[in-house]
């Protein structure tokens, strides 16, 4: 893998999400085993609660997008094309808050715990505020990156 260079690519280059479904602001760190991104809830967004915050359950999607950034950057630095993947599930998503306040940046960290050649993987993910080690949310995500996403979807209709 080529050594990561700054600045990192824009998250829109690494994820298939567009418009209001792209919840991450930028990449702040990358290693072979982990990615760190920033996300800032917006008060007027589609998900905003009565106080303008982001409900904590959306933290799961923030984590999934952080995993996608990690895989996307790994492909980027290896000179490989981007591929779609899927979130299979999570084990015990825990949040210390009911919502993430609008306008307050958060650090979303996704660390690869396991990855096999078939594309099956597991990531330990956390959400916190910059400079504050107190966790706002944490979970283990199970993910899958099929070799041929379109064939996978055809074989596994919803």
Q: At which residue positions do the language-model features occur?
A:
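Hydrophobic beta-strand-centered segment that forms part of the acyl-chain substrate-binding groove
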Residues: 69-107
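Small-residue-enriched segments and motifs
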Residues: 22-25, 88, 108-110, 139
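Polybasic, low-complexity association/targeting segments
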Residues: 1-8
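Catalytic strand-loop segment that frames the active site of acyl-thioester-processing enzymes
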Residues: 19-55
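Short aromatic-glycine motifs in intrinsically disordered, low-complexity regions
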Residues: 8-18
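A generic structural motif
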Residues: 28-31, 94, 114-116, 145
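HotDog/MaoC-like acyl-thioester-processing domains
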Residues: 3, 69, 99-107, 111-158
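Compact, glycine-rich, soluble single-domain proteins
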Residues: 51-70, 84-85
